Amino acid sequence: MSQSVGFNWGFKPSTAENTSSAISTCKVTKPRVKRRFAGEEAASGGSPTYNNRPRAVAKRRTAVSGIQGQPLPLSRALELMDRTQLQSTLLELVKLHPEIQSTFMALQPPSRGLDQYVTLLRGKLEQVYANLPYSRLRDRLPDDTGEGLNDYTFVRVKSFLLEFLNCLVDCLLESIPPQVQNPLHSLKLLDTATGLLSQLPHFSTASNNYYKNVCYEQVAEIWSTVIRQATQDISFLGATSTVLDWLQILQKHNEKSQGKLQRPLSLLQTFQESLEPVQAPAGISQDQQQPSNLWNNIV
């Protein structure tokens, strides 16, 4: 059978006829390919089969069976962040993706509670006093009178002072119409914010008080806007805090600011004078007054 086929299985020696027949067959098939492949191996300097084996073994060694570490889910990562980290992450996220700013603001409430604003503003004011350069100045009460602080002190606290003033204006603008329709809420925050503004330290150089004076001008304009809105709201007239009460509060703020709130004070005085003819006598309590008559007089 082997003679009819023309070759022998394996590498056993064969007859001359079979050998010549096998050689003639290999000339047109495998041997030419093998010789070319051998030439390529000689040019590369080695067998590619042996070069690939270490790589295959290395890949198998890197495969590790068992539990592997993984990052926290988003909800857990947020739980582990403190307030400062969360704020910085949100701000950085909005900077990288400005298109989400409108969505983020749409999810915010239209206004916050009075305590939230006051807590934030008090913290900003405390930062101003905490960064005064001398301990005797840090222990000084805001209402203490005396000569103003020097230029060096202003440089040290300027950034904290501006942060407080900007925060104060931002909080007030969010708490006035049309953002908030409750005039009493706006007036209460104005009362507290104006009191905190008066507690800022005074500087001996007039130019160093520029930012504080500009903020007083803005606060005065906000007072005037809220007073106009309140005098058109009947709920303001029927509230426990009367016009006379707010007039006294605004007079105290105007005295502390050295007349910087004279414009809203005059506006409220004018409105109060228009109510004098319908004010109840001294023996009659305010609860016995008729709100309808008072409202008709305003209209």
Curated annotation (Swiss-Prot):
Annotated compartments: Cytoplasm; Nucleus
Principal location: cytoplasm
Domain of life per record: Eukaryota
Gene Ontology annotations for the cellular component aspect, listed alphabetically: cytoplasm; nuclear membrane
Keyword Protein transport tagged: yes
Gene3D superfamilies per the UniProt record, alphabetical: Tethering factor for nuclear proteasome Cut8/Sts1
Annotated TM spans: none
GO biological process: nuclear protein quality control by the ubiquitin-proteasome system; proteasome localization; protein transport
UniProt keyword list: Cytoplasm, Nucleus, Protein transport, Transport
Any GO molecular function: proteasome binding
Keyword Magnesium: no
Subunit architecture: Binds the proteasome.
Purpose: Involved in ubiquitin-mediated protein degradation. Regulatory factor in the ubiquitin/proteasome pathway that controls the turnover of proteasome substrates. Targets proteasomes to the nucleus and facilitates the degradation of nuclear proteins.
Family, as annotated: Belongs to the cut8/STS1 family.
Name under which the protein is recorded: Tethering factor for nuclear proteasome STS1
Gene: STS1
